[in-house]
Amino acid sequence: SIRKYTQEALSPEAVKTILEAGLLAPSSKRCTPWEFIAVEDNETLARLSECKTSGAKPIAGAALAIVVTADMTLTDTWIEDASIAAILMQLQAADLGLGSCWIQVRGRFGAMDEPAEDFVRETLGIPEEMGVLCILSIGHKDEERKPFDEEKMMWEKVHIGKW
């Protein structure tokens, strides 16, 4: 996860490419319950960064936030389907040399124990039937993170054929 970004805007082509990755994501029974809100307005980004008590600050410094929602009335796998779309957008951003961070919204709380989902829903006018899963903050990296150490991979967590 990259949490610090430069002030450089993303090209319209980059934004489109990232969103296409989400739109092309697989979903259970091809019901495609997810819908995305792409936010580039600094004032709205700052507001969204206040959706929960901790962990959402990277949104304020990002060039783009993608709010990942899904229609809860279409399928009981909306969380899984939206998660696949979200991670594919993060992988696409990485492929473009950009940084991103998954900010969990579903099941989290903001000030005065207000559900973060309600805060985001009210801020962006999201209908009640849409579950708000997460917000992806995306931008040009202003930090580098050390990659995972392959020598510390926990292969004992992999089971072949049976437990």
Annotate each predicted stretch with a short phrase:
Residues 1-163:
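Acidic, surface-exposed loops and disordered segments
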